[in-house]
Amino acid sequence: RFPKFKREMSRRRVTTDSVLLGLERLLLGLASIVIVANWALRRALEMVQASMASEPVFFQHWVSGCFEWLQIFFSFGGYSAVAIGLAKIAGITIEENFNAPWRASDLVDFWRRWHITLSSWVRDYLHGPVSAHFRWPATGALVAMIAMGLWHDFSWYYLGWGLWQGLGIVL
């Protein structure tokens, strides 16, 4: 990873185009965070929850979970866009962090498309070596997903979340 970054830094050039493209990406990222994630989706969820008061609790939680996923995507995607935009303004091109995760055909494909920078690092430095050491890819997948869970928060909840994701990939 460092050689690629070093090469990108040596090619770094600030141009009018890079500044304009960077500003566009930065503004789209801020709009994604402020308008979509923090305002529109929250208001929409409040309205949906109010209208679902008589629906089964499971359905209410399922709909709330879908809104939470959208809110995380637009918030995190927005922050990633802000970082990409700031880098572009400085003449640096950095990796995209999302590639249409909603188009994923399965859980493995989802993790190739969601939080690409973390997923690829975990794949290269945990999943690959652990799978090679134990000669069983399932072990690598479980260790990788548990590590990703614990990366988000060192707690029982995220340990379980990582295990759940790992089992979903293995099975």
Task: Walk through the language-model features, giving the residues of each.
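Membrane-embedded transmembrane alpha-helical bundles that form the catalytic cores
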Residues: 1-171
